[in-house]
Design a protein with these regions (language model features):
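Vicinal oxygen chelate
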Residues: 1-46, 88-92, 149-196, 200-207, ...
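Asp-box/WD-like beta-propeller blade repeats and closely related beta-sheet repeat scaffolds
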Residues: 17, 21-35, 51-72
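Core segments of cupin and vicinal oxygen chelate
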Residues: 27-28, 86-130
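Exposed loop/turn and edge beta-strand positions of beta-sandwich/beta-sheet ligand-binding modules
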Residues: 33, 80, 117, 129, ...
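A structural feature that tracks compact, well-ordered secondary-structure segments
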Residues: 48-50, 96-99, 107, 122-125, ...
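Long C-terminal interaction/binding lobes of large macromolecular proteins
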Residues: 141
């Protein structure tokens, strides 16, 4: 959140044996931040740390008329763009990297039904979003399992589904509701091959008092998956 925290985190990474590369001033300017650094986690995912975002406070004007996306709480608190799921074949070391060094907390541990040996750690930052990051204990050819963006109403979700259908997008999962974060969502295949979860109604947690849970079911209902090139 500030320069001191940025420096402390970079120093902790170096102390733990990770190589931290400082970003150039030009690249920081392109990212609209004061400074940033890159590091590779134990599973080979490159991440960036930064501080000092530049803001112009221009409101979002969606070309599709979306009223807004859920990125804050109580009008001021920052919850980020949504969430990101990364592949983590070196699972234990990668989970430790994000919890012990980066400082995230475990929200939920999921053992997906029908996927022998699979495990997902859902992690929260210092804000009420149920998870901002999740780690899946398997490699992924694109380096990203999926991203999630959240809209403010069920009608916005429905209109987005209509636009996706009209555009011929592949639905990787039908409408459903997850168990752990209560998100009502669909999964779409983006042109680059990354899955995008488009959701509504995710729960909020207290990151200071939340106690991690263990789930053996992924969904309350729905979310019938259909992967391209995979026959039933």
């Amino acid at each position: 959140p500030d320069e001191d925290a940025f420096i402390r985190t970079c120093e902790a990474l170096v102390e733990a044996g990770h190589t931290v590369t400082e970003g150039s001033a030009d690249n920081a300017k392109r990212r609209c931040v004061t400074a940033f650094a890159t590091v590779v986690d134990p599973s080979g995912n490159t991440i960036e740390l930064y501080w000092g975002r530049e803001l112009d406070y221009t409101p979002l004007i969606s070309p599709q008329g979306v009223a807004g996306f859920v990125t804050s709480y109580q009008q001021t608190g920052d919850m980020g763009f949504g969430h990101l799921v990364l592949p983590a074949p070196d699972f234990d070391a990668t989970s430790t990297f994000y919890t012990e060094i980066i400082g995230m907390g475990i929200t939920d541990i999921l053992y997906p039904p029908g996927m022998e040996g699979a495990k997902i750690h859902f992690m929260h930052a210092n804000n009420p979003r149920q998870h901002s990051l999740a780690l899946f204990n398997a490699p992924h050819p694109l380096g990203v399992v999926h991203i999630m963006i959240e809209v403010e109403t069920m009608d916005e979700l429905g209109r987005g589904m209509d636009r996706a259908k009209a555009a011929g997008a592949h639905f990787m999962a039908t409408l459903g509701r997850h168990v752990n974060d209560n998100m009502c969502s669909v999964y779409l295949l983006a042109p680059g091959g990354i899955a995008v979860e488009f959701g509504y109604d995710g729960i909020l947690i207290d990151p200071q008092t939340h106690v991690a849970t263990v789930s053996t079911e992924g969904d309350l209902w729905g979310h019938e998956y259909s992967f391209p090139g995979v026959e039933d």
